[in-house]
Curated annotation (Swiss-Prot):
It comes from Clostridium novyi (strain NT). GO terms for biological process: translation. GO terms for molecular function: structural constituent of ribosome. It comes from the Bacteria. This is Large ribosomal subunit protein uL30.
Length: 59
């Protein structure tokens, strides 16, 4: 299964509470920080929900 590198590129200040919770659930706290995740349907759904805040690369 492929890996995804997810990077927070925009601030979560002033965003909807469920979007903030989704970003936090992905393990992202600060702008510019990245985390690695397995490419699963659950992770893809979270990424799609807040895609306007993230940069995603397949590895």
């Amino acid at each position: 299964m492929a890996k995804l590198k997810v990077t927070l590129t925009k601030s979560i200040i002033g965003r909807k509470k469920d979007h903030i919770a989704t970003v936090n659930a992905l393990g992202l706290k600060k702008i510019g920080k990245s985390v690695m995740h397995e490419d699963t349907p659950q992770i893809r759904g979270m990424i799609n929900k807040v895609s306007y805040l993230l940069n995603v690369e397949e590895i």
